[in-house]
């Protein structure tokens, strides 16, 4: 009896054909456990070995590459914009400021403005026909502008009240005069004549025959008379 019990225990220990349920359970345990456990191993294309949970976290290879390219493009555009802004700021810093005029230049400019205003008033008196009141006002303004006792703010106020923006008017008049001078200088230049024009206006000078010259010289000195008979 002891020997039969020992043989039965060895048969139960070794798996054989008589235990199909155990082998099926052993085979099905792998897929069931992998489906139930989210941390089972899978292979993602283009990526190292990872779990299913990690595969949800990172995108696929192509999507990740496009996202990284977009980020790089955004960074490049930002860098270019910052460089451009920096260049504009540097150019603004390097731009020279307007140099104020010296005392001598200011005095000369004021003299030119006063002379222009006085000239305009005198031309208005000559060309126009002002009434006595306007004539008196113009003469008084000329005296005020030419007076050395009148303060400078008073002169500028008077010029502004009479002519408005007199500096802009002076600039426009100066440009017009410069344009007229350029036109006169251009018209005064000797321009070459075309060959066709020279051929049309060309004159042929030929010497006179000798016999005609002698005939005019050998005329007698007799008085000319009409011979009707």
Curated annotation (Swiss-Prot):
The modification Omega-N-methylarginine is found at residue 27. It holds the Pfam family DUF4615. Residues 70-79 have a biased composition (Basic residues). InterPro entries: DUF4615. Transmembrane segments: none annotated. The modification N-acetylalanine is found at residue 2. The keyword Acetylation applies. The modification Phosphoserine is found at residue 82. Keywords: Acetylation, Methylation, Phosphoprotein. The keyword Mitochondrion does not apply. Residues 55-101 are annotated as: Disordered. Belongs to the UPF0488 family. PANTHER family: UPF0488 PROTEIN C8ORF33. This is UPF0488 protein C8orf33 homolog.
């Amino acid at each position: 009896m002891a020997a039969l019990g020992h043989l039965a225990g060895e048969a139960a220990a070794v798996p054989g054909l008589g235990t199909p349920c155990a082998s099926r359970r052993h085979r099905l345990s792998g897929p069931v456990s992998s489906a139930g456990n989210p941390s089972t191993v899978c292979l993602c294309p283009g990526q190292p070995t990872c779990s299913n949970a990690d595969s949800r976290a990172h995108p696929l290879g192509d999507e990740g590459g496009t996202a990284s390219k977009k980020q790089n493009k955004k960074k490049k555009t930002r860098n270019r914009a910052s460089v451009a802004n920096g260049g504009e700021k540097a150019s603004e810093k390097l731009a020279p400021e307007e140099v104020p005029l010296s005392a001598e230049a200011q005095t000369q400019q004021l003299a030119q403005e006063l002379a222009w205003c006085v000239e305009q008033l005198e031309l208005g008196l000559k060309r126009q026909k002002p009434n006595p009141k306007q004539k008196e006002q113009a003469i008084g303004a000329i005296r005020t502008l030419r007076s050395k006792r009148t303060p400078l703010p008073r002169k500028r106020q008077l010029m502004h009240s009479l002519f408005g923006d007199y500096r802009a008017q002076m600039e426009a008049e100066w440009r017009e005069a410069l344009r007229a001078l350029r036109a006169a200088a251009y018209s005064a230049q000797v321009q070459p004549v075309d060959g066709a024009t020279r051929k049309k206006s060309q004159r042929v000078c030929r010497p006179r025959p000798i016999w005609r010259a002698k005939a005019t010289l050998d005329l007698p000195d007799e008085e000319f008379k009409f011979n009707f008979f």
